[in-house]
Amino acid sequence: MDQWRNRVCASWVLLLSLLVSALPVDAQHAAVEPSPTASPSPTPAVFSPQTLADLKRLQQEALNSDYAYRQVSHLTNNIGPRLSGSAQAAKAVEYVASELKAIGCEVQLEKVMVPHWVRGEETAALVQFFGQAPNTTQKIVLCSLGGSVATPKNGIEAEVLVVKNFDELKSMPREKVAGRIVLFYYPFDKQMAAQGQGGEAYGEAVVYRSHGPSEAARQGGVACLIRSVGGADYRLPHTGLTDYAKDAPKIPAGAVTAEDADLIADLVRQGPVKMKLVLTPETLPDAESANVIADIKGSEHPEQVIIVSGHLDSWDLGTGAIDDGAGVAVSMEAANLIQKLRLRPKRTIRVIAWMNEENGEAGSKQYAKDHEKEISNHFAAMETDGGAGHPTGVNIKANPEVKKNFAPVAAILQESGAGILRLVEHCGADIEPLEKAGVPAF
């Protein structure tokens, strides 16, 4: 087994075991107060030699295990894309529940009603532009944004207006935008991503996917396109959810490949460009689904819950291996290794495979509602949904003193190249309701 690939499992399991075995009960509200007479020590007293030894055991076991990879393989190869409401999403719920029962977890399915949006025909072509060869058109590769409404059956044919950002759009008189297809031409900042700020780069670009269609509609646009968000090009469109504002008309919305967005922008600089656009997605009635909840009961504080999680649903244009099959599999691996090594967590470990993170977050919202009276007993919540490459460390949304208490674990994680601890304002979409309720998030 390639140990480099398994480091993500090792890092996640070490973090989980720290929270299970090391932090005091009140760690989420205050740091451990040192004795006034004690000598300074780089290791807080909450870490016993046995705890640190268990962390090392977990690290080695995780590096040598292929359990998580086998789970991802089944989710992607045997089930496939898992868009909320689909048959594949339902099969994934059954599979993950069965696997977690097999390793000895107490498993239940908690009902969630999820949006059921389905993709339809997606075609576009440039039918008129400066310098056009006679009797030709230019094919444009694109996909509908999640939740998009459809064009009329025969499509829309309109001039394309290219804008760089919201400010440029809002500065234009309405008559210049009305009746046009608006293309937000905002390239993903690959340099920022290369410097370790991929999340920030993604966030800067994704606002045009989330809010672009409504902003274009307010100005009279008949459809909205964005330059696909992300660093991978290869003429592949990148989908994601668009968030229609309640006070704006809903217009068809899509993502154009980076290469085709570049083409359109270049042609528009030379003269007017007209596009024929056909998108036929459909929103069906909400469908019944479930969050998968799997517990390893705590030996001393079973009422206190530590969540380790990933989201089981995925977009339909890929197999959902990275987003977020890997996150679900790593969470399952954490439980698997704790059971395999016969460790007895003090607090209840709750593995959650969330449903509907991608286009509604219905699963996390329903969990927060169903467990509202128990939120005060949620000791910590962890989510992995940031990719499946080599991990660099752990994000922390908690009391800053908690970061200091993590120093011994960071030292062990660094042996796998994943020892960076970073205080952040937000850790994950699915644990956000718990974050807002004051639960420490990782």
Which residues does each predicted region cover?
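Bacterial N-terminal signal peptides that target proteins for export
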Residues: M1-V13
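Bacterial N-terminal signal peptides
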Residues: S11-A22
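Noncatalytic luminal/extracellular "stalk/propeptide" segments of secretory-pathway proteins
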Residues: P40-F47, T51, E61, S73, ...
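Soluble metallo-hydrolase cores and metallopeptidase-like ectodomains found primarily
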Residues: L52-D54, Q128-F130, V141-R174, T242-A321, ...
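Second-shell loop/turn segments in exported
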Residues: L55-L63, N77-A87, A158-V163, M172, ...
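Metal-dependent peptidase/peptidase-like ectodomains
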Residues: L63, K101, G131, K153, ...
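Short helix-loop-beta-strand segments that form the rim/entrance of peptidase-like active sites
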Residues: R70, N336-A362
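A conserved hydrophobic secondary-structure block that centers on an alpha-helix together
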Residues: N165-G231
